[in-house]
Amino acid sequence: MNLIEIREGKASLLIPNPKDYEKEGRYDPSWSPVFYNPKMRLNRDISVLALSVIKPKSVVDALSASGVRGIRYYTEIGGIEKLILNDKNPIATELIKKNAEKNYVNARITTKDANSLLYEIKADFVDIDPFGSPAPFILSAINATINKGYVAFTATDLSALECSSKFSARRKYDLICERLSFSKELGIRGLIAKVIREGAIIEKAAYPIFSFYFDYYYRVFFRIENGAKKVDKLLEKQGYYYECSKCGYREVDYYAERKICPRCGIEMRRYGPAWTGELWNREFLLSMKENLKNFTYFDTFMQVNKLLNILVEESKYVSPYFRLDFIASLIKRNIPKREKMLECLKEASITHFDYRGIKTNKEIDEIVNCIKIN
């Protein structure tokens, strides 16, 4: 295997030469014998930033591939006393050993099935960053997380979570769903709901503290706390979102029944079960923003800063975003400028989920009125 050296964050890494695995001038990281995706750099930068707030003593990267994520945590955060880097691919674990030595990282490196490993150990922070769906690893990852510890999941199977693929959504995430105008946000709410339900099985409450959508994936961090009563309170915030495709009316209910729009008389589209609470712990979010000044070396520093600024404003509003082009088309009006809408609504912000959307806790009628006068 021909290796090349790259640098990411403060880590120097050996990875398989992508040129050796090109097909007709194209390259996909999954074609390499050891997976390394440069497009996930922002994901890893933000994760390093999040861990600078969490300050874990023990970390598990259960699907390590090249080892980049765990190695960066160790070298850039400090204070990690126990690091486990795991991959079931023996070629990957051999490369992880080289990369760990190269960066003076003291880690336990294992070649195990991720679920098997996670049922054997406990850690302050568990990271699940799969190629595809995290669903097969959710329960074991929560089980491996100590009380008042943290776990993070990446999901790249947006076709399931956003309900482009209904059968996949049902199989992986127990979703009964159709595509709504704000499906980009519903996807992350569906993922959160699934994690909460999996934690409920073993009476562990999974509180979402930081979430974001970027490019083609979701990333969510949870704080885990033991206790059946805590779990019950979280489960009370699982519900179904409904939207009328004719007038844009929407509502939330806690039962998966079919509903007729009270205004138009047509059957509304639905999505659920989904998390109906906050996507961000504001204190955690502000701590991340404060710590960012220590990571000016990030290649994605400007992107991360911009994203955090949006999230700080967005976190003021619990309700899912409204898509302006969707509502404007229903009332046969031109799409207004977002700035005009924010000025009209007064209590609103842009959203990172969709450049066509705005976040507000106001109702559809107020959105419609603002579109009409702008």
UniProtKB/Swiss-Prot annotation:
UniProt catalytic activity: guanosine(26) in tRNA + 2 S-adenosyl-L-methionine = N(2)-dimethylguanosine(26) in tRNA + 2 S-adenosyl-L-homocysteine + 2 H(+)
Cystine pairings recorded for this chain: none
Entry binding sites for Zn(2+): 244, 247, 261, 264
Sequence positions that bind S-adenosyl-L-methionine: 44, 69, 87, 113-114
Domain of life: Archaea
Keywords (A to Z) from UniProt: Metal-binding, Methyltransferase, RNA-binding, S-adenosyl-L-methionine, Transferase, tRNA processing, tRNA-binding, Zinc
Primary enzyme class: transferase
GO biological process: tRNA N2-guanine methylation
Entry keyword annotation includes tRNA processing: yes
EC nos: 2.1.1.216
A single MF term (Gene Ontology): tRNA binding
Sequence ranges assigned to domain Trm1 methyltransferase in this UniProt record: 4-371
Signal peptide start and end residues: none
UniProt feature coiled coil, ranges: none
Cross-referenced NCBIfam families: PRK04338.1-7
Function description: Dimethylates a single guanine residue at position 26 of a number of tRNAs using S-adenosyl-L-methionine as donor of the methyl groups.
Similarity-based family: Belongs to the class I-like SAM-binding methyltransferase superfamily. Trm1 family.
Protein name: tRNA (guanine(26)-N(2))-dimethyltransferase
Species for this entry: Sulfurisphaera tokodaii (strain DSM 16993 / JCM 10545 / NBRC 100140 / 7)
Organismal lineage: Archaea, Thermoproteota, Thermoprotei, Sulfolobales, Sulfolobaceae
